[in-house]
Protein backbone atom coordinates (compact mmCIF):
# COMPACT_ATOMS: atom_id res chain seq x y z
CA UNK A 1 0.00 0.00 0.00
CA UNK A 2 1.41 3.38 -0.98
CA UNK A 3 0.22 6.93 -0.34
CA UNK A 4 1.28 9.50 -2.91
CA UNK A 5 1.71 13.10 -1.83
CA UNK A 6 4.29 15.12 -3.74
CA UNK A 7 6.04 17.95 -1.95
CA UNK A 8 8.19 20.36 -3.91
CA UNK A 9 11.51 22.05 -3.16
CA UNK A 10 12.43 19.71 -0.33
CA UNK A 11 15.98 19.48 0.97
CA UNK A 12 18.43 16.80 -0.28
CA UNK A 13 18.32 13.50 1.59
CA UNK A 14 21.07 12.10 3.82
CA UNK A 15 20.21 8.53 4.84
CA UNK A 16 21.76 6.55 7.68
CA UNK A 17 21.66 2.92 8.69
CA UNK A 18 21.36 2.57 12.46
CA UNK A 19 23.35 -0.38 13.82
CA UNK A 20 27.14 0.02 13.52
CA UNK A 21 26.64 3.07 11.30
CA UNK A 22 25.16 5.51 13.81
CA UNK A 23 24.90 3.20 16.81
CA UNK A 24 28.16 1.69 18.07
CA UNK A 25 27.50 -1.80 19.42
CA UNK A 26 30.59 -1.69 21.62
CA UNK A 27 28.81 0.60 24.09
CA UNK A 28 25.33 0.90 22.50
CA UNK A 29 25.63 4.65 22.07
CA UNK A 30 25.74 7.07 19.16
CA UNK A 31 29.12 8.87 19.18
CA UNK A 32 28.98 12.54 20.13
CA UNK A 33 30.52 13.51 16.79
CA UNK A 34 27.71 11.73 14.93
CA UNK A 35 25.01 13.44 17.02
CA UNK A 36 26.65 16.82 16.44
CA UNK A 37 26.78 16.09 12.70
CA UNK A 38 23.08 15.21 12.61
CA UNK A 39 22.28 18.50 14.30
CA UNK A 40 24.35 20.46 11.77
CA UNK A 41 22.78 18.61 8.83
CA UNK A 42 19.24 19.25 10.03
CA UNK A 43 18.97 22.79 8.68
CA UNK A 44 19.88 22.00 5.07
CA UNK A 45 19.12 18.29 4.60
CA UNK A 46 16.29 15.81 5.03
CA UNK A 47 17.52 13.25 7.58
CA UNK A 48 16.39 9.69 6.90
CA UNK A 49 16.98 6.46 8.79
CA UNK A 50 17.16 3.31 6.63
CA UNK A 51 17.26 0.28 8.88
CA UNK A 52 16.29 -3.33 9.37
CA UNK A 53 14.63 -2.29 12.63
CA UNK A 54 11.06 -1.20 13.16
CA UNK A 55 11.89 2.14 14.73
CA UNK A 56 8.37 2.37 16.17
CA UNK A 57 8.97 -0.72 18.33
CA UNK A 58 9.58 -0.35 22.06
CA UNK A 59 13.12 -1.65 21.47
CA UNK A 60 13.99 1.22 19.11
CA UNK A 61 11.71 4.17 19.87
CA UNK A 62 14.23 5.76 22.27
CA UNK A 63 16.78 5.87 19.44
CA UNK A 64 14.19 7.40 17.12
CA UNK A 65 13.46 10.12 19.64
CA UNK A 66 17.18 10.76 20.10
CA UNK A 67 17.91 11.03 16.36
CA UNK A 68 14.66 12.82 15.35
CA UNK A 69 14.69 11.83 11.65
CA UNK A 70 12.42 13.49 9.10
CA UNK A 71 11.54 10.11 7.59
CA UNK A 72 12.28 6.43 8.24
CA UNK A 73 12.71 3.43 5.96
CA UNK A 74 11.87 0.69 8.48
CA UNK A 75 12.33 -3.06 8.19
CA UNK A 76 14.42 -2.93 5.02
CA UNK A 77 11.87 -0.89 3.09
CA UNK A 78 8.70 -2.77 4.01
CA UNK A 79 7.43 0.23 5.99
CA UNK A 80 8.13 3.90 5.29
CA UNK A 81 7.06 6.77 7.52
CA UNK A 82 7.26 10.53 7.20
CA UNK A 83 6.71 11.93 10.65
CA UNK A 84 3.89 9.82 12.08
CA UNK A 85 2.37 9.02 8.67
CA UNK A 86 2.89 5.64 7.00
CA UNK A 87 3.35 6.37 3.29
CA UNK A 88 4.14 2.77 2.24
CA UNK A 89 3.92 -0.72 3.70
CA UNK A 90 4.28 -4.28 2.44
CA UNK A 91 3.39 -7.52 4.24
CA UNK A 92 5.25 -10.79 3.71
CA UNK A 93 3.45 -13.25 1.44
CA UNK A 94 1.86 -15.81 3.77
CA UNK A 95 2.29 -18.88 1.55
CA UNK A 96 5.94 -18.03 0.96
CA UNK A 97 6.35 -17.62 4.71
CA UNK A 98 4.95 -21.12 5.30
CA UNK A 99 7.38 -22.56 2.77
CA UNK A 100 10.35 -20.84 4.42
CA UNK A 101 9.32 -22.03 7.89
CA UNK A 102 9.00 -25.61 6.63
CA UNK A 103 12.39 -25.37 4.91
CA UNK A 104 14.12 -24.07 8.05
CA UNK A 105 12.45 -26.63 10.28
CA UNK A 106 14.37 -29.37 8.46
CA UNK A 107 17.75 -27.77 9.27
CA UNK A 108 18.58 -27.91 12.97
CA UNK A 109 21.68 -25.75 12.46
CA UNK A 110 19.70 -22.59 11.70
CA UNK A 111 16.61 -20.72 12.80
CA UNK A 112 14.12 -18.57 10.91
CA UNK A 113 11.27 -16.48 12.23
CA UNK A 114 10.15 -13.03 13.28
CA UNK A 115 9.33 -11.03 16.38
CA UNK A 116 5.79 -9.67 16.55
CA UNK A 117 3.94 -8.03 19.42
CA UNK A 118 6.48 -8.92 22.08
CA UNK A 119 6.79 -12.59 21.10
CA UNK A 120 9.49 -14.37 19.09
CA UNK A 121 8.16 -16.90 16.59
CA UNK A 122 11.22 -18.96 15.57
CA UNK A 123 11.90 -22.54 14.53
CA UNK A 124 14.71 -24.11 16.58
CA UNK A 125 14.61 -21.46 19.33
CA UNK A 126 17.70 -23.03 20.90
CA UNK A 127 19.71 -21.64 17.95
CA UNK A 128 18.43 -18.13 18.67
CA UNK A 129 19.09 -18.59 22.38
CA UNK A 130 22.70 -19.59 21.69
CA UNK A 131 23.17 -16.71 19.22
CA UNK A 132 21.86 -14.09 21.65
CA UNK A 133 23.81 -15.47 24.59
CA UNK A 134 27.05 -15.49 22.61
CA UNK A 135 26.54 -11.88 21.49
CA UNK A 136 24.94 -10.25 24.52
CA UNK A 137 25.42 -12.67 27.39
CA UNK A 138 21.73 -13.48 27.73
CA UNK A 139 18.56 -14.23 25.80
CA UNK A 140 15.42 -12.51 27.04
CA UNK A 141 13.11 -13.59 24.25
CA UNK A 142 9.59 -14.95 24.68
CA UNK A 143 9.39 -17.77 22.16
CA UNK A 144 6.11 -18.84 20.57
CA UNK A 145 4.93 -21.29 17.91
CA UNK A 146 6.45 -20.19 14.55
CA UNK A 147 3.52 -21.70 12.66
CA UNK A 148 1.37 -18.89 14.05
CA UNK A 149 3.39 -16.36 12.02
CA UNK A 150 1.31 -16.68 8.81
CA UNK A 151 -1.73 -15.57 10.82
CA UNK A 152 0.05 -12.34 11.82
CA UNK A 153 1.10 -9.21 9.95
CA UNK A 154 4.80 -9.79 9.22
CA UNK A 155 6.93 -7.50 7.06
CA UNK A 156 10.33 -9.21 7.22
CA UNK A 157 11.81 -12.40 8.65
CA UNK A 158 15.19 -13.12 10.21
CA UNK A 159 17.63 -15.97 9.61
CA UNK A 160 20.03 -17.07 12.36
CA UNK A 161 22.90 -19.21 11.11
CA UNK A 162 26.05 -19.12 9.01
CA UNK A 163 26.66 -17.55 5.61
CA UNK A 164 26.59 -20.88 3.77
CA UNK A 165 23.09 -21.58 5.06
CA UNK A 166 21.94 -18.07 4.15
CA UNK A 167 23.16 -18.49 0.59
CA UNK A 168 21.39 -21.86 0.35
CA UNK A 169 18.14 -20.28 1.51
CA UNK A 170 18.50 -17.48 -1.01
CA UNK A 171 19.05 -20.02 -3.78
CA UNK A 172 16.02 -22.06 -2.68
CA UNK A 173 13.76 -19.01 -2.48
CA UNK A 174 14.62 -16.57 -5.30
CA UNK A 175 11.68 -14.39 -4.24
CA UNK A 176 13.66 -13.10 -1.25
CA UNK A 177 16.93 -11.37 -0.48
CA UNK A 178 18.89 -12.92 2.40
CA UNK A 179 21.25 -10.12 3.48
CA UNK A 180 23.92 -11.12 6.00
CA UNK A 181 24.44 -9.02 9.12
CA UNK A 182 27.90 -7.53 9.57
CA UNK A 183 28.99 -10.21 12.05
CA UNK A 184 27.91 -12.91 9.52
CA UNK A 185 25.92 -14.91 12.07
CA UNK A 186 22.48 -14.05 10.75
CA UNK A 187 20.57 -12.27 8.01
CA UNK A 188 17.47 -10.31 7.11
CA UNK A 189 14.99 -12.19 4.92
CA UNK A 190 13.10 -9.68 2.77
CA UNK A 191 10.87 -10.11 -0.25
CA UNK A 192 12.47 -8.56 -3.33
CA UNK A 193 9.50 -6.24 -3.80
CA UNK A 194 10.93 -4.13 -0.95
CA UNK A 195 14.40 -2.90 -0.01
CA UNK A 196 16.14 0.09 1.49
CA UNK A 197 16.91 1.27 -2.04
CA UNK A 198 13.25 1.07 -3.05
CA UNK A 199 12.45 2.95 0.14
CA UNK A 200 14.84 5.73 -0.85
CA UNK A 201 13.30 5.88 -4.33
CA UNK A 202 9.82 6.10 -2.80
CA UNK A 203 10.92 8.95 -0.51
CA UNK A 204 12.48 10.79 -3.45
CA UNK A 205 9.16 10.46 -5.25
CA UNK A 206 7.26 11.64 -2.18
CA UNK A 207 9.48 14.68 -1.63
CA UNK A 208 10.11 15.33 -5.34
CA UNK A 209 13.87 14.96 -4.86
CA UNK A 210 16.15 13.49 -7.57
CA UNK A 211 18.16 10.41 -6.58
CA UNK A 212 21.29 12.36 -7.47
CA UNK A 213 20.54 14.56 -4.44
CA UNK A 214 20.82 11.70 -1.95
CA UNK A 215 23.61 10.37 0.26
CA UNK A 216 23.42 6.96 1.99
CA UNK A 217 25.61 5.55 4.78
CA UNK A 218 25.78 1.86 5.70
CA UNK A 219 27.89 -1.02 6.99
CA UNK A 220 26.30 -4.38 6.08
CA UNK A 221 24.79 -6.21 3.13
CA UNK A 222 21.26 -4.95 3.70
CA UNK A 223 22.78 -1.54 2.86
CA UNK A 224 24.30 -2.72 -0.43
CA UNK A 225 21.42 -1.70 -2.69
CA UNK A 226 20.85 1.71 -1.11
CA UNK A 227 24.58 2.52 -1.18
CA UNK A 228 24.66 1.59 -4.88
CA UNK A 229 21.44 3.51 -5.65
CA UNK A 230 22.06 6.78 -3.80
CA UNK A 231 23.74 9.73 -5.48
CA UNK A 232 26.67 9.16 -3.11
CA UNK A 233 27.05 5.82 -1.34
CA UNK A 234 29.28 5.75 1.74
CA UNK A 235 30.54 2.64 3.56
CA UNK A 236 31.70 2.85 7.14
CA UNK A 237 35.28 1.85 7.91
CA UNK A 238 33.88 -1.10 9.85
CA UNK A 239 31.68 -2.18 6.91
CA UNK A 240 31.74 -5.56 5.20
CA UNK A 241 34.29 -5.72 2.39
CA UNK A 242 31.61 -6.29 -0.27
CA UNK A 243 29.94 -3.04 0.73
CA UNK A 244 33.22 -1.11 0.71
CA UNK A 245 33.82 -2.28 -2.85
CA UNK A 246 30.36 -1.09 -3.91
CA UNK A 247 30.56 2.31 -2.22
CA UNK A 248 31.64 5.60 -3.76
CA UNK A 249 33.59 6.40 -0.61
CA UNK A 250 34.82 4.55 2.49
CA UNK A 251 34.90 6.66 5.63
CA UNK A 252 36.30 5.88 9.07
CA UNK A 253 34.70 3.43 11.48
CA UNK A 254 31.67 4.22 13.61
CA UNK A 255 33.92 4.76 16.66
CA UNK A 256 36.42 6.92 14.75
CA UNK A 257 34.13 9.80 13.76
CA UNK A 258 33.23 8.16 10.44
CA UNK A 259 29.92 10.00 10.03
CA UNK A 260 31.38 13.43 10.72
CA UNK A 261 34.50 12.87 8.62
CA UNK A 262 32.53 11.80 5.54
CA UNK A 263 30.12 14.73 5.85
CA UNK A 264 33.08 17.12 6.05
CA UNK A 265 34.77 15.38 3.10
CA UNK A 266 31.73 15.91 0.87
CA UNK A 267 31.06 19.44 2.10
CA UNK A 268 27.76 18.60 3.78
CA UNK A 269 28.96 20.34 6.94
CA UNK A 270 31.91 22.51 7.90
CA UNK A 271 33.91 22.24 11.09
PLM region spans:
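Short, acidic loop-to-helix structural element flanking the phosphoryl-transfer center
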Residues: 27-45, 89-96, 105, 137-139, ...
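Conserved acidic, metal-coordinating active-site core of Asp-based
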Residues: 103, 107-226, 238
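Active-site phosphate-binding/coordination module
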Residues: 32-128
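Short active-site oxyanion
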Residues: 44-48, 68-70, 154-157, 212-214, ...
Amino acid sequence: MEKRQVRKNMKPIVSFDVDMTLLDHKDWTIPDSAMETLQRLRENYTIVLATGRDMDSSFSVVLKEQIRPDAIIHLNGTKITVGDTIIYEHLFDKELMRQIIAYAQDDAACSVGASVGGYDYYVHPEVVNRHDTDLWGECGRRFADPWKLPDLDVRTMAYIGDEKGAKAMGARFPEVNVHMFAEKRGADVVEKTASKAMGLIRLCDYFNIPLSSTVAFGDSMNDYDIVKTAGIGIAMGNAMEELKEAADYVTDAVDSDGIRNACVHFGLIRL
